[in-house]
Each structure stands twice: as C-alpha cells, then as structure tokens.
Amino acid sequence: MSFFSKSIRAVSDIIDEAVRNVRGRISSDVSFSEYVNEIEKEAHRLYLLEEKRVVREILLKEINPESRLKDTLQKVADIVVELSTVIANTRRSRGGMSSEYILSYALKEYGIDNEPVGRRRSKKSYYPDVAIPSKEALEKNPNGVIALAVKRTLRERWREDIPIFRHFPNAAFVCLSDSADITEGKLLDMQEEGLRVLFLPDNLYFSLKGFIEEDIKRIEVYELSYLPRWIRAKLSLLR
C-alpha cells in the first residue's frame, strides 16, 4: 500500500510543527537535552496522529458502506494485516530521518550551522547523519568538519555507526531520547567496539555517571546538554 507512505506528511513538516508547538509551551531556560526530548516526543505524537488519519482515509476508501457486515469485517481484517507491515516499515525508515532532523533543528536554535546529510552507505564508504557546518564542507574536507551519528534510542543498530570514528577525526555518537535503553553492559560493549565520543540524555548520563567515571576509560561520555559547547570548542580548534 504505497498510498500509506505517500500520504504521511514529510518528516520535515512534522518536525516543523513539533518545534512550533514546543516553543510555545517551554521556558526559555530549559536545557538542551530537555528541549530535544520535548521536540522528539511531540514529533512522535504528531506522527501517530498522521498514521491514524491515513488509516482512516484508507478504510473509508476501501470499505463499501453497502457491504454486509461479514464482508466488511473480512475486508477490514485484510487491510489491517497488509497495513501492519507497511506501518512498521514506514516507521522504521522515517524514524531514522526524524532523529537527525530533530537534532539539526535544535542545534540551529542554539546558533550552530549544520546540515542533515541523508544517510548513504556502501561497503566502501560511510556518511554521518549530521555534518557541521554543512554537507559541502564534509565533501571537501572530512578532517575539517564535525560529524554526528544520531540515534533516537540504543535499541537501534548502534554498531553500524562505529565507522564514523575511522572516517572522521571530529566525530560523536548522539543518543536523543531519555527513554533509551542504555545499560552498563551496553556502555562496555560500546567501549570494546571502538566508540570514542558519546552524548547521552542528561538524566541517563547522571544516572550512570558513577559507573562511567569508574569503568569507561576509552569513551568520552557527556550529557547531551553539553553538546553545543563541545561543538563550539571543536569548531574553534578547526578554524
């Protein structure tokens, strides 16, 4: 059902609306981490509303109101089965894009020029999710930019982003959602896999701070609210 994926609003449009809604209800002194999480939660809420709207349109389009109840129920069941896979695939593909766009929007709000790259991968190359200051700068001089890999949670395939630290000397892995399933064991796995710089939502970082200081020696781990300052410090060294 290509109609479903084509009918859902673009990720950028949903996040635009989420940002406007969040701006109108949060205080000006909110932390960067909380700001990002508020946008992420609002974007998720809006996306679910989009799903419901499109599913309703499909049902109204496909169901004949004159049909017998038995036939109608069978038709609904067939549509639901088909849609379940389509919805899951659409969520997966758009979820990755939404994370990078949310972070990009938030960084721009903090005065940091950046650009979502649009993930491209092959066996021979790796591209990050967000380039600072731009994709053009990334293409021209990979050593002179900051490259960010972005994940909403760590249930996602974080190992696929380890190459960012081989391709870009100024790189970081950023986890956005404060509902991320980060554990001590996962941090140890990341350390063994070669992850070098990690930003975690503030509440998760501080809940694990003791373990991080004691056992995580080969990863620079920071709270998410520190990211804008970290970027500015890196940029000052690159100029």
In which residue ranges do the predicted regions lie?
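Acidic-basic catalytic patches of nuclease active cores, encompassing PD-(D/E)XK
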Residues: T72-S122
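Intrinsically disordered, low-complexity, charge-dense segments enriched in Lys/Arg
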Residues: S2, D78, R92, A180-L187
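Short secondary-structure transition/capping segments
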Residues: D78-I79, Y126-I132, G185-K186, G210-F211
